[in-house]
Amino acid sequence: MSDCYVNNTIFEIKAPEGKTTDCIERNLRKAVNHQSPNIVLDSFRMKNIHNKSIPSFLIERLSRRHGIQRIIFVNLKREAIDINSLLR
């Protein structure tokens, strides 16, 4: 079951706990395979990962697609960044 609707689109909210990008990869896989291809990734609980490195990692994952349609990244400053708009 997905977490929320944004502009009539179902999104799954993920807030992974971890110290590497592996935790992000795992959560993206879970969301796409079992919940929704539209993902909101909140970095609030991630420690020791720089906020600047996460968007580049997400851009790489989105460019490969693998079932992901849209990613919105919420950084530690609580700013929402649409990763799809950075891909273009």
Question: Where are the language model's segments positioned?
Answer:
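Metal-dependent nuclease catalytic core centered on acidic motifs
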Residues: P16-R88
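Conserved catalytic cores of phosphodiester-cleaving nucleases, focusing on short active-site segments
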Residues: C4-E17
